[in-house]
Amino acid sequence: MVDQPEGTGRIVVGVDGSDSSKQAVRWAVRQAEVTHGGVEAVTAWEFPQFHGALGWLPPSSSDEGALKARALQELTRTVEEAVGPRPAAQVRTEARYGTPAGVLLHAAEGAALLVVGSRGLGGFAGLLLGSVAQHCVQHAPCPVLVVRGEEG
């Protein structure tokens, strides 16, 4: 067996529940099937900003566990909606704390490809990528593919 360079075959896909991210998951799984690679479906979660009479209120440690569990549950549901319970390639899911762009760039280190969705708006606005996709295209440590959602 020939050793493959680090990252060969690992495809990271950003998932936020949108139609375009579901399309990105579908594309990543098809590509992984063809290249005999694996997919790492990643979502980001952050603490909501709580403000009280005395200003910003820090979250409790129980909030952290609940927020991460909810993000992972939503990620798993979205992946299953996109490719079913038994996809054609291995899909690993991970919910990470941080901003979407930051989480995706960190996850993409050593990956063969980063796949993200774009909410393409059509017309002039459609020429612009979403801010997360744009940031990833400009700063990713690997090639990036931006997938548009189905037009409807």
Segments the model singles out, each with a brief description of its role:
Residues 40-42, 92-96, 145:
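General small-molecule cofactor/ligand-binding pocket signal
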Residues 59-74:
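A short acidic, glycine-rich active-site loop
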Residues 1-7, 20, 34, 80-114, ...:
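Structural beta-alpha unit
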